[in-house]
Amino acid sequence: MSNSHPLRPFTAVGEIDHVHILSEHIGALLIGEEYGDVTFVVEKKHFPAHRVILAARCQYFRALLYGGMRESQPEAEIPLQDTTAEAFTMLLRYIYTGRATLTDEKEEVLLDFLSLAHKYGFPELEDSTSEYLCTILNIQNVCMTFDVASLYSLPKLTCMCCMFMDRNAQEVLASDGFLSLSKTALLNIVLRDSFAAPEKDIFLALLNWCKHNAKENHAEIMQAVRLPLMSLTELLNVVRPSGLLSPDAILDAIKVRSESRDMDLNYRGMLIPEENIATMKYGAQVVKGELKSALLDGDTQNYDLDHGFSRHPIDDDCRSGIEIKLGQPSIINHIRLLLWDRDSRSYSYFIEVSMDELDWIRVIDHSHYLCRSWQKLYFPARVCRYIRIVGTHNTVNKIFHIVAFECMFTNKAFTLEKGLIVPLENVATIADCASVIEGVSRSRNALLNGDTKNYDWDSGYTCHQLGSGAIVVQLAQPYIIGSIRLLLWDCDDRSYSYYVEVSTNQQQWTMVADRTKVSCKSWQSVTFERQPASFIRIVGTHNTANEVFHCVHFECPEQQSNQKEDSSEEPGTGDPSTPNQQLDPHAPRAPSASSLPPSPGPNSRSPNQQNQ
């Protein structure tokens, strides 16, 4: 037998959901004037409504219609100002049905609708309308949308408007909407470092705005112009004839321009958060260095001794280097680069940025540290057009090799000390390109794979012979470290003694923990004064069972959230709260040790080191 009823939303057995029918029936009350007990007047148009529905849906109307004021009288007519009939019609439909159609409305109506949602306290409607407005931003509507978003403190819509205006700064300056901006909104736009139009264009647009807004304080507006960024010709032939800036202000700008370092000027730059701008898409190119084409092609897998990298010879005066020119001045605070890592070599280098290729500011200095593979670098935000990477050392030869380069602005929080990152998360992982460069294991990086449960007499640990060698971990780059954590092999009741040293160059070592006279078992938490470290060396000095020191897991800095060991846990199960690390496909693969003891025993020795 056929079913003549319309399709209904699927509901679970035992649940009835007829909300759509309820919405339709209540919405039908808007069509006629039946049962209406209050009337709103907007632009001389009357809107009959129902007090109880309005009060149930909105705290504002509840107070207005049932608060004992004049509007609470029966059959009252309530005039509403500062809105339009079209926007109020949309709001009433939303109140009665929970629905609103935005796609067919003009931007002005949508902004009035957004204002009503804010005024009457409909946060979900406010969010949904803001999200739709984000999708229809264009040169004609972005300024008035930004004005409303700023007025009502709508962070997402405000941010999207700013990003759109930043990427279309010159077009926005020339638009009619720019002249209609409020003074507050205008200053919020042009004071941004990321509003990267030429300063002359900004000055002329502000001059035009002042002519259309004669009652405003023009001096305050003109203070937003960064006069030192303008040329002498522009200052004398464009700014001076306007009469809006004093001769002293112009002379001060000339003085700042002539006496300051170029990189100390308050430049504007393009801001594209969380996206690599060192790409052909954004007009970036390698302008100095050998084999330029490989650096920005995005290929981080297909490289070897002969291809897939850019390079430069390492010389004592550091005149050589690899230089990238960005498509336009940009704001960056994060660089990622991949050093050639098909063997165990390490590099030292520094990175400088510039606007004119004459004045360079050093933002990263790893010239006294040994680094390998992926470098994740952070520094205070800078506006720059040129980036120069200069290699100062290669442990194998006199050539500096880079496989890939990325730069961007990131909103990720980071802490710097002495120019180095102070990590909060464990950086001794395969994904972070850390490596075990000394010590014996069936898999050389088993110590760093995050597995603290699966180990036994035969596998899952790294070891060294007491009195000979050590376990050494190399981090991909120097960090400021103040803690580490170890899991000593604990499948029986043995105990160990050991000490820990750190280094930045494998030459000078600093002892940070001395437990040579302590009986240690299982998990070890080591804290010490924070200091730069690229290498961590763990040296076992005693084992109550045999002549080999065994370590299952290493991390730095210590991850406090992982310290949930159960006192009743069986030996060998490790810490179940520690997640496994995923293998980075770009990380170097370690060869297996040439000689491994069948169980924790005295026959360990260090793996052979490659010298290619």
Swiss-Prot record:
Residue intervals of the BACK domain: 142-240
Compositional bias ranges of the Low complexity kind: 589-612
One of the record's GO cellular component terms: glutamatergic synapse
Alphabetized Pfam families for the sequence: BACK (PF07707), BTB (PF00651), F5_F8_type_C (PF00754)
Taxonomy, superkingdom: Eukaryota
Record region (Disordered): 559-612
Tissue-specificity statement: Expressed in the brain (at protein level).
Gene Ontology biological-process entries: adult locomotory behavior; circadian behavior; circadian sleep/wake cycle, non-REM sleep; long-term memory; modulation of chemical synaptic transmission; multicellular organismal-level iron ion homeostasis; regulation of synaptic vesicle endocytosis; sensory perception of temperature stimulus
InterPro entries: BACK, BTB/POZ_dom, BTB_POZ_domain_cont_9, BTBD9_BACK-like_dom, FA58C, Galactose-bd-like_sf, SKP1/BTB/POZ_sf
Ranges for domain BTB: 36-104
Name this protein carries in UniProt: BTB/POZ domain-containing protein 9
Gene: Btbd9
